[in-house]
Amino acid sequence: MQSFSISNNASISSYAYPKTASWKIRGESSDCCLWDGVECDEDTGYVIGLDLGGSSLHGSINSTSSLFQLVHLRRLNLGGNDFNYSQVPSRIALLSSLTYLNLSNSMFYGEIPLEITELSHLTSLDLGRNVDSSARNLLELGSFDLRRLAQNFTGLEQLDLSSVNISSTVPDALANLSSLTFLNLEDCNLQGLIPSSFGDLTKLGYLNLGHNNFSGQVPLSLANLTQLEVLSLSQNSFISPGLSWLGNLNKIRALHLSDINLVGEIPLSLRNMTRISQLHLSNNRLTGKIPLWISNLTQLTLVHLRHNELQGPIPESMSKLVNLEELKLEYNHLSGTIEFSMFASLKHLTMLQIRRNNLTVLTNISDNTTLPKFKYLALGDCNLSEFPDFLRSQDELIYLHLGRNRIQGQIPKWLGDIGHKTLSILILRNNLFSGFEQSWELSLLTKLQWLELDSNKLEGQLPIPPPSLIGYSISNNSLTGEILPSLCNLRSLGFLDLSYNKLSGMFPNCLGDFSDSLLVLNLSNNFFHGRIPQAFRDESNLRMIDLSHNQLEGQLPRSLTNCRMMEILDLSYNRISDKFPFWLANLPELQVLILRSNQFFGSIKSPGAMLEFRKLQIIDLSYNNFTGILPSEFFQTLRSMRFSDLKEFTYMQTIHTFQLPVYSRDFTYRYEINLANKGVYMKYWQIPNVIAAIDLSSNAFQGDIPQSIGTLEKVNALNLSNNHLSGDIPSVLGNLANLESLDLSQNMLSGEIPQYLTQLTFLAYFNVSHNQLEGPIPQGKQFNTFDNSSYEGNSGLYMKHLPKKSECSEPPQHPNLPKHQGFNNILPKDIEWIAVVIGYGSGLVVGVVVGLRVSARIPEWFVKTFGRTQGNRRRREVRGVRR
């Protein structure tokens, strides 16, 4: 092992230590059988065991390694190291006596060599969890497929291929491994049906098929696996699986059935599992009440029922589950009033999450009642009106969520006293807090990483949190004054949202200084003035900048080109005076550009070769002073709008995952959008990644509408209103198959409305008023739904027949959006609409306002910046089932 370097960051285990370092201390002349991790045969002296798991090794295993001379080796453990994306060496086949091989969690990359099948004596093979920090599976099965594995390893008792990219169905032949007691195929991109032959693996005590793409029904033959103690089928696409067969598995200790499309009530068959310790049923569609019989499962330590549709009260009988450590009931429809003292008997309870229900929680606890020491406590949306006094004794809190209540008054000083050692995440948003008792300073919370104080009644200067902070959101308060220089001491800051306050002064230069860590910067809706400084450094990781609704002026800083990861840039409603920033095309990830309502001027025709905006989907240049023609090549640069690809539906957002003790927590910063759609100004709380919109309204563009617009088939909304455009309406606009809103009003367009536009079957809003159009108004399909106001101010237009209500008054469903999620209907049911009727020509208002949203799907790594908390170690936390 002399070719390896020793790195403290080469293993994620807290128990790792460099075993090979002791070999040098003992000296090469010493007996190697006495070295750490080495086992020798007592009779022959041959090395038969080598355990270098978690030994902080970094490097690769080359073909000349002395490792392959240990031909008598029976057990080899190299798991938990960093082999730096090297391949599993094919010469490992020389170790033909191996019965145990562990190469897990060690950054091996590429296809598993076929030669490994020559190790026919193996009883345990672990190649699992070779993933990087972005959750990418590094190993592939390749020609070493499951069928060949089943043929060559007939003596296998333990097999772990978790996070190996297999990408196939599971062959029936796998059931030939009849000696298996442990099988982990989690996160292998498996698909199709689970073979019924799995029921023949009757010795299995551990079976993990989670995080795959299995479909259909779960085979009833799994009822034969009566030795199972751990079963995970989570995160698959089963069709309403029936679970009556679970009643046979009375040895189960851990059951993971989250996110598998379960419907109906919590299965009655679970009540036979009297040994069960962990019950995971989250992210399904379970209804009804929490059954009373669940309190008879007295061995339970974890109950996860979050994200379902459960109703009724939390049964008081759950207080009998005296071994309970984690209880997650958030995001259901639970109701009623509960006394918090009901949890006093659960002395081991460290995690309680009951937010986002319809509960009223009474937190007055008598002096002689002793509550458990919580580490994770989520009481959001629990109708609290005062800060819970019982928290005074909760000095082990890591995560505290009291958001969306009605808590008044000041944030108590004792919170700083009890939280200074452990509190990492504090969420107090959407309350009525007016300040901090005795002006105590947030810097007391020295471990704090995430802080949300949005939507309260805080006044005065911006509170400065401790340097440990990664996310800080204090939007929608009444803070005043300038940003203090001490804010720039937050060198780890990744998310900063100070929007919707009354802050003033110059844009702080230092915010650009730590843009290598900063991902989201939102200073919108304040009173900042002056120039945006040339402060954005090389290697910036900024994804989103929102400086809209301020009083900023001058030119755009060219240092923005350093923000190569930028996705959203919103500078609307300022006083910026500059030419069109063609150079922003150098930002390869830019998706949304909002320059609305500034003092930009001149032509948008590039003086040189036009660079491509490769990913731009929303561009708003409205209400500026742009002049000249609309250059054809400008629209040709909008590459991502030219193709209507059916990519996976998501929302534009940035996610950060905290790896906390016991579990991880995702925080999603989801971008929002303001639209004037169908003449109504609305706020959309989420931006689907399939939306494309162009707004060039209220400028002084002239000349013809370029034919090249007709190639932008992905565009949903096009607004060219209130300019000086002339000539005909090009019939190629009929090629915009996804168009839902078209506004050409307040121009000097002439000629007829092309009949070809009737092919736009998604068109829900059409306005050509106040032009010089003539001839018949097209009839049929969506054109039968537009009223006269769409055409007024064109004296030469006429209708052959009066418009009447059509059966297609609602546009067909857009193919790129989920059902009931058209461009005009992407709002969740429970959010507020902001609607103001606007006049003609006022345009499509596309403005990005960023809102903070929190989710807790566990765990999903995303931000590489924070995935490497120590050195350059590349890893993803294991998301698997606890053994």
What are the functions of these language-model segments?
Residues M1-R883:
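Plant-biased, solvent-exposed loop and capping regions
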